[in-house]
């Protein structure tokens, strides 16, 4: 906090130097990133730190960017990447998820298809199962069977809609 508020940084004791602090450059700024507190493994920020920060919630990427990211991270075809992104965005749009799916879900599905050499058009049942398993897991933190079954049903409908 001292480097943000007072523009000094405390140095560890025992460095053998006379000065116990370092002046911070007057133009010093910092960018902090964090996940929402409801994510597993995230700890609440200290109030003193939060008082000195501006929080900017970021929205999801646009459709084209999600397709490009999915394709780049998986090396799948553009058509397959578009289909995966459409399914994930369709699920997100329903608003029925505890946590909306992100581009990470797209990447996980795409990489699974690539590694397993699965063609969604020829293996629709396997493709549907992969999408259901990944998206039910990504959108729920409590693991409620009822919620996961509902998500899997929605995903099945979306796969039927977009896998042609």
How should each PLM-predicted stretch be described?
Residues 1-164:
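C-terminal regulatory/interaction module of P-loop NTP-utilizing enzymes
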């Amino acid at each position: 906090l001292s480097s943000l508020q007072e523009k000094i940084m405390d140095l560890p004791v025992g460095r053998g130097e006379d000065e116990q602090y370092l002046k911070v450059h007057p133009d010093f700024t910092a960018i902090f990133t964090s996940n929402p507190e409801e994510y597993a493994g995230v700890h609440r920020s200290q109030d003193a730190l939060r008082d000195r920060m501006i929080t900017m919630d970021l929205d999801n990427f646009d459709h084209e960017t999600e397709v490009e990211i999915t394709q780049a991270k998986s090396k799948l075809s553009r058509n397959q990447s578009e289909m995966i992104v459409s399914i994930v965005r369709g699920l997100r749009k329903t608003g029925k998820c505890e946590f909306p799916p992100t581009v990470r879900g797209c990447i996980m599905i795409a990489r699974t298809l690539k590694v397993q050499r699965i063609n969604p058009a020829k293996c629709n049942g396997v493709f549907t199962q992969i999408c259901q398993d990944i998206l039910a897991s990504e959108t729920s933190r409590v693991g409620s069977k009822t919620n996961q079954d509902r998500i899997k049903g929605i995903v099945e409908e979306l796969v039927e809609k977009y896998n042609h």
